[in-house]
Amino acid sequence: MSADGKFGDYGGQYVPEALMPAIEELTDAYERYVLDNEDGFMDDFRARLRDFGGRPTPLQRADRLSERYDREVYLKREDLLHGGAHKLNNALGQVLLAKYMGKERIIAETGAGQHGTATAMACAHLDMPCEIYMGERDINRQRPNVFRMKLNGSEVNPVTVGRGTLKEAISETMRDWATNVEDTHYVIGSVVGPHPFPSMVRDFQSVISEEARTQAREKLGRLPDAVVACAGGGSNTMGAFAEFVDDEETALYAVEAGGSTLEVDEEAGVAPNSASLTTGSEGILHGARTRLLQDRDGQIMESHSVSSGLDYAGVGPELAHLVDTGRVTAVNVDDDAALTAFHRLSQMEGIIPALESAHAFGYLESVVGPDAPDAENADDLGEYVVVNVSGRGDKDLESAIEETYERDIDIAPNMDEFTGGL
């Protein structure tokens, strides 16, 4: 990364003049507290991750998946982190940083509700008032997490503009921040936005790969041949990859949401997927240059995924750069494959994954499963594979049951009695 926050052609700071003082203040705080550990900030952060968050999370062998796929499959269990997802790593770090900076109010956006929940928990823990912006469509898809945010003392502001999803929630949160920069910190939930957010969020999330790398050496006596993680904005992806980037012997796979199809209708302004690394083009979104889903006129298209947390039209600039350089391989899994993987992991390992995480397991099935359509790529995964379980699926139960019933997923149990809701 360059001094101005660029990763090759991507990144940078494309924000209104009114936000530049806040961006500069945050950049200074990031360099002093996170990079230089001023006042023991990182020591404080890691202690809280341990005591409040429950780190380290285990690296667990998936016995039945290993047998099914004829290779050693290990799961990095971020679903066991306090709150049920990797999101606390970043939320706790940023809320603590805001406290060190003397800020008095926290705002955040959320899609699936996991980042909002993690931010609400961190604010309750650190005694900071908090407001969460969430698209109306996502509120309807993720009602349990809305209740959890409110239960932790945060306000939840519905966003009704556009499609009412993550993209619109980020835009509304940015507007709030621009109006209240003096006393407010915006806790961005992914490795997106203007510098220093992509680097800062990656650094807070890198504890995932830091632990996984050490645990792999302890359990396997070596590094894994491949690390697989789902990719929306890219926070769990970069967290799972960060400490492996310099290990050329470890392949890195970012699994995007292929939605219903990779075909894009530019005339209608609709991308029935959220695969910006696969089908997107270079542009500017939410303060950074990156790869995104846009039409010929540069207008952001509507994205789609069965998973709220992957339903985003862009991706983090560093991840886009790593794909361009060939260090990370971008792949995709459609809605049906993700839902099937959701049921398979639940039935075979007793772990109900978030629909986001299910995309990573869907890719595994597509490459090394008994009837794998992409079996020619099986050797690339190698003998030892680590899959990041970015979160647990409690939040997705209602939508997963509805989607399963509509799609007639082969391996799913009979859901007829539940189609009216849980």
Curated annotation (Swiss-Prot):
Pathway: Amino-acid biosynthesis; L-tryptophan biosynthesis; L-tryptophan from chorismate: step 5/5. Pfam families: PALP. Its cofactor is pyridoxal 5'-phosphate. GO terms for cellular component: cytoplasm. GO terms for molecular function: tryptophan synthase activity. The modification N6-(pyridoxal phosphate)lysine is found at residue 87. This is Tryptophan synthase beta chain.
